[in-house]
Structures are given as structure tokens and as C-alpha cells.
């Protein structure tokens, strides 16, 4: 009698991290477990200094199941290895290797990223933009012996979007005491909301362009009798008191040179549960969402925001335009420009370009949305319905499975053999022969 053993799939990524990569890793783990084709094991990784608290609440669906699959090291080579990371970290550990990355927020990836993608058998990115940038990248690498090697992507790459939990992120009037209590301190009845990290870079050079959002908003609505407010749900890389103080200082330094009576800007800093964040998206005082982002590999917070059914004003370039069609979304025009030196890091290189919003147009759109708000509601509701149907977790999981099925080889089948049990037969004791 024999039993077939499932091939082993090891997923390595920041499954417990409070980050976009953490959300993505956790969703992939859940999809692979539900598929039930593999014996899924998970190797957790850190993601910078982001809090590792994603799996703390075991009452959430699948959390216990995900935690039960966590291992500390590999004892055998897995048939399938899925790594969720930036491409230069990709390592082909399995018999078949899949690299998953949010991709790129600018026009040029580092050569090391293309080399990393080429180490894997298959690569998955969340947007058409990310795929286009990687496919179009080409470099020449000069070796010590003088030989020149052309580097370009030579492995398959597929688009599988990041799904959103539409059971949590949805249009709702349900109160949430913790968030409602924080919002009581805001007197304005019309607030714009930004959600995202405020990371390195001078004014106009942080990737989400939060600094210029603060400046433009302050200038548009200064000295007005009836003014909206801007809520920033943001942080640097941590939720520490020092981080909060630094964010407040940035806001002050941007607004201090401006004259006149400025509109209020409020900071919500610290960790929130998905339910609290969804309540913020849906709070009656939050009327619209806004982001001047320079570029997104996908832009999950923007997708979440659309599910509130409220207008979204954002940049018209990069990964998020997949789920923000021009006919329904309010996309801001702009131009491509060099990534500033203060923004360059391990993945944003000085040779690359990103998107700069036309701030004069953005200013007019902010004002028009405030004055003519009702006119923006129908398209926002249509976009909510469309994204709820197309970009949920189930649809993303289905696409992931379909994509893997197209590419995965037939792994060698392993079986365990159970031998039948036999009764122990005692041999008769024969006395030793004696010599005559």
C-alpha cells in the first residue's frame, strides 16, 4: 500500500512584517496553503525596521495556519521555492524557483536586479508598469578580462496583482471607537486623507512626495474662511516617539515660511489594525483621498482607499494606474524627471526618472474637488464596485494559481510504502545433534 507525498513548497518573505511586502507575503502563503497541492513551509524574514506584528492576532483568519507552517531552516531541497523580496536578494534554492517582487517605482532598475531576476525560473510582479520596466532594461557589464556582457531579462515574468481583503476594506458606516475617538479632535467636516510612509528625501524628493502635498495644500487653502483639513496617516520606518517628532518637525519646517492663515494638518501616527484603517478611510469627516506619489510598484493603500467609494486624487503614472482607469479616477498630469540625489538608495538609482506631479494643476484639482465635491461621487462609486470585484484576495489567489500552473514542471512523485504486517512465527527449538 502506498501514499503519495505532496511536493514541498518553501515560501521565504517578511510574512509577519507590517509593510506592503508583509501583506503580499502573507497573502501568497494563504493562497498556496488553500491550493493544497504542496506541503507549504514558511521562512519568515524581516523587512527593514518595520514592526513584526502581522501574525500577533491569532483570531484573524489563517494566522494560526500560517504560523504552524513556519520553519527556521531547510533540511531538504524543496521542489518549489518562492521568495518575496527585492530582486538582488533572489537565490535559487529549490528545484524550481519563483521570485516575487513589488518591482520598481522608477524607470530604471539596478543591473543587480536584472541579474537577480535571471537567477529564478519565473518572476512575478504586481503591475504592468513593473513588468514593462524590467523587460525593457538592458545593460553592458565589463568583466576584468575586458569582455563585455549584455545583461537583460531572459527569464519569464508575469503580472499577478496584489489582492485586497474586501471583507475588511469596504464601504461601511460601522463605527470603530478607537478611531472615532481620535477623529473627534478634528473640527473640520471635510478632510483629505493621505496614507503612506514619509521616507528619505528633501522637499519634493521623498518617494510619496508627502512634503509637497503639505506645501501645496497649505498654499491652496490659506486665508480661506471655509477650509478643509489634511490628515496624514504616516510615519517613517517605525512608530517610535522619535519618528513622530521627526514627522511633526518636517510639517512645521515646510509650513513655517508660508504667510497667512494656514489650513489645519493633522497627523495620525502609530500602528493601526486593518479595521481601524478602514474606519479612517470611511469616516464621515474624510471626504477624499490624495497622494502625489512619484511612483508605485503597485500602490496597495491607493487600492484600499478606492473601496471606500470616495474620490481619489493621485499621480497618473506607474503601477497604480492598473486599478485607476482614467475614466473613473482623478489622475494628475505631470512629467518625468531625474530622481534627486537625496532620494537615491539601494533601489532608486541616480540614472532613473520618476513622475513629478504638475503642482499647479494639482492645486486647482484640490480646490475643485472641495468646491464641487458631489460631482466626483458617481465615478468614485463606480470605481469602488469595479475594484471590489476585480482586485479582491480570491481573484488574486486564482490568478496566482493559474500562473503557476502554466509554468511549473511536473515534479517527481514521491510515495511512502506501507508494508503489510505479518505475524511473528516462532521457529521450533531443535535440540543440537549429538555425535554417535
Predicted ranges, named:
Residues 1-78, 229, 398, 403, ...:
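N-terminal pre-catalytic "stem/leader" segment of glycosyltransferase-like enzymes
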Residues 2, 344-436:
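C-terminal amphipathic helix plus adjacent low-complexity
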Residues 3, 10-12, 49-133:
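Extended catalytic core of nucleotide-activated donor transferases of GT-like folds
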Residues 24-26, 30-31, 166-279:
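Conserved catalytic-core segment of nucleotide-activated headgroup transferases in glycan assembly
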Residues 122-178:
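Donor nucleotide-sugar binding/catalytic pocket of nucleotide-sugar-dependent glycosyltransferases
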Residues 279-297, 307-310:
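Acidic donor-binding loop of glycosyltransferase active sites
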Residues 299-302, 317:
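Short glycine/serine-rich donor-binding loops of glycosyltransferases
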Residues 311-314, 330-331:
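Short hydrophobic beta-strand element within catalytic cores of glycosyltransferases
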